[in-house]
């Protein structure tokens, strides 16, 4: 559980960074930080099942299989994790900034919800 707690702390730090980047109008970087915050929370949840993966797709897929399909978390959480991943790909790898202010705000709000939901669940697992 210590590793899961460390991942949650890192996720919270990344979410704060995403908020600062959004205020600075660095939308691509804000989305990237938000996605990674969500990713770390998904990893923390998977650790409770002694699962660890080396790829983003592996974490996202396993999170869906073990937490969304089983009804532990609502389907919307899985959709938002996938959406954040897709937007992060655009923001990190496209040559021009294609992430809008509105999209970055939406991803940030989804990230907050994702992190709060997973963190609340993790607290109950102790």
Language-model-derived ranges and their functions:
Residues 1-126:
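Terminal alpha-helical segments
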């Amino acid at each position: 559980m210590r590793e899961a707690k460390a991942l949650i702390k890192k996720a919270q730090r990344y979410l704060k960074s995403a908020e600062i980047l959004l205020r600075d109008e660095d939308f691509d970087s804000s989305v990237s930080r938000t996605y990674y915050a969500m990713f770390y929370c998904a990893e923390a949840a998977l650790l409770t099942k002694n699962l660890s993966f080396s790829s983003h797709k592996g974490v996202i897929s396993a999170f869906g299989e073990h937490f969304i399909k089983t009804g532990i978390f609502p389907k919307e959480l899985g959709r938002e994790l996938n959406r954040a991943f897709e937007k992060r790909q655009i923001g990190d790898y496209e040559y021009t900034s294609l992430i809008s202010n509105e999209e970055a705000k939406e991803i940030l709000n989804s990230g907050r919800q994702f992190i709060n939901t997973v963190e609340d669940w993790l607290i109950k697992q102790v």
